[in-house]
Amino acid sequence: MATRSPSVVISDDEPGYDLDLFCIPNHYVEDLEKVFIPHGVIMDRTERLARDVMKEMGGHHIVALCVLKGGYKFFADLLDYIKALNRNSDRSIPMTVDFIRLKSYCNDQSTGDIKVIGGDDLSTLTGKNVLIVEDIIDTGKTMQTLLSLVKRYNLKMVKVASLLVKRTSRSVGYRPDFVGFEIPDKFVVGYALDYNEYFRDLNHICVISETGKAKYKA
């Protein structure tokens, strides 16, 4: 029986790292409180998740479905590691990619209203083994809605990999199959996670400051 893989749990009192210890774009220095997860740690953890995905799904042709926009960096890096495992293993699998775009945030709050604003015809997923790749699970409502949508197409298998899962009282209890980091209820940006489209160009995952929220508020 398949089990959900463990995650790196970051405690509520984790202090993070001073911005001065890392290379931060000057235009964001006043907008961030701290570096929360350095880029190198993200990459090492993603490499391990790739191994977990291959162990769980590696006997099948996989359709990797990227949730845009925030998931694109994690998606690209995860697939690079999976491709490396494919190249260096006796057992390799074909993989194809597809994309879907959802919208559920306004400023720093998940609205609970899920809008599908892009993506190809999901009927192409019928009978396939699908790996959905997401940047962050907050309340879990977005992913539950997406799963209910794709399951209408009689998938052979569906698994979810999320770089982050947030501990929050607003959670509906959903937990992905593969999780990079479990984090406190803080609004984080960087590594393609955005605040109203800003901060996607930041390599590290950081905690946004109140100054940053005010500056980039919609």
Curated annotation (Swiss-Prot):
Binding, GMP: 69, 134-142, 166, 186-188, 194
Binding site for Mg(2+): D194
Pathway: Purine metabolism; IMP biosynthesis via salvage pathway; IMP from hypoxanthine: step 1/1
Protein EC: 2.4.2.8
Catalytic activity: IMP + diphosphate = hypoxanthine + 5-phospho-alpha-D-ribose 1-diphosphate; GMP + diphosphate = guanine + 5-phospho-alpha-D-ribose 1-diphosphate
Additional remark text: The cell lines from which this sequence was cloned are revertants from mutants with no detectable enzyme activity. The phenotypic reversions are the result of overproduction of variant enzymes because of gene amplification. This variant sequence is expected to be very similar to the wild-type.
Modified residues (Phosphothreonine): T142
Subcellular location: Cytoplasm
Organism of provenance: Cricetulus griseus
Residues modified to N-acetylalanine: A2
Cofactor: Mg(2+)
Active-site residue list: D138 (proton acceptor)
Name of the gene encoding the protein in the UniProt record: HPRT1
Protein name: Hypoxanthine-guanine phosphoribosyltransferase
InterPro entries (UniProt xref): HGPRT (IPR050408), Hxn_phspho_trans (IPR005904), PRibTrfase_dom (IPR000836), PRTase-like (IPR029057)
Organism phylogeny: Eukaryota, Metazoa, Chordata, Craniata, Vertebrata
